[in-house]
Amino acid sequence: MNVLLGGFVIFATFVTLCNASCSFMPNERFPGDSTRECTDLKGNKHPINSKWQTDNCEACTCYETEIICCTLIATPVGYDKNKCQRIFKKEECKYIVVEKKNPKKTCPIDQWIL
């Protein structure tokens, strides 16, 4: 029974990670353009097959034909919203959930959404 439960937990984690919110942007190249790089929305250039993290907490990858960026932010949804509040820590790209009356005390979280 424990093996079955452990397998379910691993499967649920995998499904959650696979549902990450991603955006796709064409890597615009022009005839005769032999550069092997992508230009992101801020105008920064990245080599083909390179990866980087944006200021908006996205993990991006440069491919020949597109740039794919996926959010790194997991949003807590399974917590006591009457007793607790979520706080976004931009420098860490994550939320924490703390008690409203005592922000030094964290709250348990049952569910996250990517």
Swiss-Prot record:
Taxonomic source organism: Papio anubis (Olive baboon)
InterPro entries per the UniProt record, alphabetical: PSP94 (IPR008735)
Family per record: Belongs to the beta-microseminoprotein family.
Keyword Transcription regulation: no
Subcellular localization: Secreted
One GO location term (cellular component): extracellular region
Gene responsible for this protein: MSMB
Pfam family, one: PSP94
Name of the featured protein: Beta-microseminoprotein
